[in-house]
Amino acid sequence: MAFEPAQHSFITLEGVDGAGKSTQARLLARALELAGYQVVSLREPGGTAISEKIRALLLDPANTAMGDTCELLLYEAARAQLVHEVIAPALAAGKVVLCDRFYDSTTCYQAFADGLDRQMVRDANNLAVAGTHPALTLVYHITPEQAALRMAARGAADRMEAKGMAFQERVYQGFCAIAAEEPNRVKLIDATATIEEVFAKTVEQVRAYGLDIPQEAVAAALAQEAE
């Protein structure tokens, strides 16, 4: 299946905290740019002035009183603004959009982990994206225990990361469930290997979906990362 301009150039990268998806998003953006694509790289929550302010509220460790429904609606507000201001216009202009987290994270964190009604979360996601859905989602597959070992070196955790191992286990199970439910869109990638090996699998999936990334661009992206 090949990408169609303005419709299928939206790729999201997902996984538990510490899975390495942000590194892979950065590498993929570089490789695509070197291959000649116009790329818009984003993260959630964030990506616009309004969305970044909401991000600060969501991740502030001091906001321990935040209720689950409040949290859900803040994520959706940040997402709605990002889609309206950046994602939809970029896709309409024929650009490739890469987003580090999107609505699958909301499903896993707020429905599977926090226990909010999944249909309510699905409806909220659909309201926020207004028909703008990712064509390909790469889930970086690593257990919460393995991810925790990586994150130990990162220092202080944000409010979401500090919710504990049982919470992260439910998030992990959520991503596994989504991958099983939507195998055409959602692809699991073993994130326990080296950065280079994981990136090779990432590129393999993106190529299979229709974006041409020459091996020279892959090598150059990895070389830049190592500098």
For each predicted feature, which ranges?
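Conserved lysine of the Walker
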Residues: 21
